[in-house]
């Protein structure tokens, strides 16, 4: 006699459930969770415990291609098939054209690509399926598509998330509080000679770190600097030390890009004659120390394209490689628009979409809600 056992989602071993959930695109998890309460509970446990992104060779993120938001899963496998990518445009946002992406605590800040100003920005929790449109009370002070922004939260128990931005019309800076659902001006000043770089901020442990440029006009020198904005004190710290020579003549000025390593460390890339990457060993709003991760002489790489401008990047400490997106305006797709550099001299390229990626952010899902808290009374 043969006995047939029907296995349903609710009776699958949790080891297998974990494996399945780790492979499901973040934008599909919401509909999947609704089919089984056990899976919903386990997916949330995975998020809180970090299992959903625990695969050290797998990276989850969002990328802008043609001003459209796409989810991207990147697997660094090693060997001949070193990289495996999966890029999918998110149909729910087909009507939105986006120019910048910022990630903080599982939330995604999306800046509109409307020229010249938009009166709203959008914040999403892709895992919870929540979206919040944030308006500005003054149309003339709308959101510039390539303005300076930062995303973070304060040290309060419930993590009040905040958005920082530079005002281009009236000057100065302002901040939005999710808790109060309001904007306010900030009493901070960087001086006339220091500028926040476009696409220049990343969020780490609630604070934002900016790539900034200080111009010394009389000496005809430019200076790269690193600056922290503390969302608890709502103020800038002092310039933080950088691990490379950060003062050069204007015509020799290099490219500096910031990234986060597993939301634990800050990484800085600097491209001039060589491409160097350093990772923080200790970081606070007013103090940082570094260790070198990678140095590459681009001119010695056989077949490396002339048109290369380092953009957003991903560091894989386990496999000792870095993935760098090419932001050059004219790219030969035969060379690829993303590059992998290894500490052992390894180099290869691959394509992400048919056009150069405009922005990228790694993503760590969370249960942070975008619902506005209602006060009693």
From Swiss-Prot:
Domain F-box: start-end pairs: 6-52
Stored InterPro entries: A_thaliana_F-box, F-box-assoc_dom_typ1, F-box-assoc_interact_dom, F-box-like_dom_sf, F-box_dom
Superkingdom: Eukaryota
Pfam families xref list: F-box, FBA_1
Protein's name in the database: Putative F-box protein At3g13830
Provenance organism: Arabidopsis thaliana (Mouse-ear cress)
């Amino acid at each position: 006699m043969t006995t047939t056992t029907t296995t349903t989602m609710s009776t699958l071993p949790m080891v297998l459930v974990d494996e399945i959930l780790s492979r499901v695109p973040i934008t599909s998890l919401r509909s999947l969770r609704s089919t089984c309460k056990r899976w919903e509970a386990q997916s949330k446990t995975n998020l809180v415990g970090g299992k959903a992104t625990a695969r050290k060779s797998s990276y989850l993120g969002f990328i802008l291609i043609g001003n459209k938001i796409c989810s991207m899963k990147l697997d660094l496998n090693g060997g001949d098939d070193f990289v495996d990518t999966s890029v999918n445009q998110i149909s729910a946002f087909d009507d939105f054209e986006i120019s910048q992406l910022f990630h903080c605590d599982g939330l995604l800040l999306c800046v509109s690509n409307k020229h010249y100003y938009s009166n709203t920005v959008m914040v999403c929790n892709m895992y919870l399926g929540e979206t919040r449109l944030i308006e500005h009370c003054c149309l003339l002070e709308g959101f510039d598509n390539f303005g300076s922004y930062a995303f973070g939260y304060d040290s309060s128990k419930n993590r009040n998330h905040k958005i920082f931005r530079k005002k281009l019309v009236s000057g100065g800076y302002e901040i939005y509080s999710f808790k109060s659902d309001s904007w306010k001006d900030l009493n901070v000043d960087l001086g006339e000679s220091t500028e926040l770089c476009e696409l220049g901020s990343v969020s780490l442990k609630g604070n934002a770190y900016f790539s900034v440029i200080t111009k010394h006009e009389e000496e005809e020198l430019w200076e790269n600097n690193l600056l922290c904005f503390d969302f608890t004190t709502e103020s800038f710290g002092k310039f933080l030390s950088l691990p490379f020579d950060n003062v050069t003549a204007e015509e020799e000025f290099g490219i500096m890009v910031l990234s986060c390593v597993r939301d634990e460390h800050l990484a800085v890339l600097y491209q001039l004659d060589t491409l160097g990457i350093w990772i923080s060993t200790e970081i606070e709003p007013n103090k940082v120390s570094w260790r070198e991760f990678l140095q590459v002489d681009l001119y010695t790489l056989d077949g490396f394209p002339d048109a290369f401008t380092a953009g957003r990047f991903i560091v894989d400490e386990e496999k000792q490689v870095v993935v760098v997106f090419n932001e050059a305006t004219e790219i030969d797709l035969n060379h690829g628009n993303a590059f992998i550099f290894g500490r052992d001299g390894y180099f290869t390229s691959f394509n992400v979409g048919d056009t150069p990626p405009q922005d990228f952010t790694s993503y760590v899902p969370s249960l942070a809600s975008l619902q506005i808290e209602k006060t009693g009374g």
